[in-house]
């Protein structure tokens, strides 16, 4: 397990400076703090103190250009509500964090998670072109992706719907109503789920 001393040795700075940077001390520059966070992630460091806190933080990361969740009629409203209804009674503090492509380019996923003391994330609304989708392939901080599937990373899991059954039910229902010309209208194929449905 990587220690604060390992980070200090790698960066040739003191252990106390690393500790201050990891704990957002005001006398550490933003540049140095970011360098320490990047080095910590590269070495596989996790903040042990975040696991000792009585409340663990999980973020729901929404790709703000692709998903809406604020109102009851929005697609992700009930999904996020259900997630909170299960996680909060289990002792987790849930924060919804909208992100965009620029933010993802500016800060790596693991660094973001370490910086904000999140123990894990639920990610919804991400397209295949989003930078963090690529990072989920090698990230160390646990993430559950909605309708995106990453192979080979034990820290990344997937939840979604059975598209085959959903399409079969929809077509059967419409055919049962007497419809014979049935079409499927899709958005752009920039998301994994739309590519699966298109195939």
Name these PLM-found stretches.
Residues 100-104, 124-129:
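Short beta->alpha connector loops
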Residues 66-74, 104:
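Short, flexible/disordered intra-domain loops and linkers
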Residues 1-6, 10, 42-43, 47-49, ...:
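Bacterial carbohydrate/catabolite-sensing allosteric modules
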Residues 94-115, 167:
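Structural motif
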Residues 108-109, 131-136:
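A short acidic, amphipathic alpha-helical/loop segment
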Residues 1-55:
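N-terminal helix-turn-helix DNA-binding module of bacterial transcription factors
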Residues 118-125, 183-186:
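Periplasmic-binding protein-like
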């Amino acid at each position: 397990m990587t220690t604060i001393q390992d980070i200090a040795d790698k960066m040739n700075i003191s252990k106390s400076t690393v500790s201050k940077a990891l704990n957002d001390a005001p006398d550490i520059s933003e540049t140095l703090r970011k360098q320490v966070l990047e080095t910590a992630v590269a070495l596989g460091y996790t903040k042990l103190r975040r696991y000792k806190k009585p409340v663990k933080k999980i973020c729901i990361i929404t790709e703000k250009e692709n998903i809406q969740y604020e109102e009851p009629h929005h697609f992700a409203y009930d999904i996020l509500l259900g997630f909170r209804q299960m996680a909060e009674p289990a002792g987790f503090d849930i924060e919804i964090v909208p992100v965009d492509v620029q933010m993802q380019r500016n800060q790596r996923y693991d660094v973001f998670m370490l910086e904000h003391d999140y123990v894990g994330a639920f990610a919804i609304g991400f397209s295949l072109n989003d930078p963090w989708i690529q990072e989920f392939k090698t990230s160390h901080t646990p993430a559950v992706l909605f309708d995106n599937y990453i192979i080979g990373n034990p820290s990344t899991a997937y939840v979604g719907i059975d598209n085959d059954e959903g399409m079969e039910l929809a077509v059967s229902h419409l055919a049962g109503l007497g419809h014979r010309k049935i079409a499927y209208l899709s958005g752009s194929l920039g998301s994994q789920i739309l590519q699966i449905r298109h195939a």
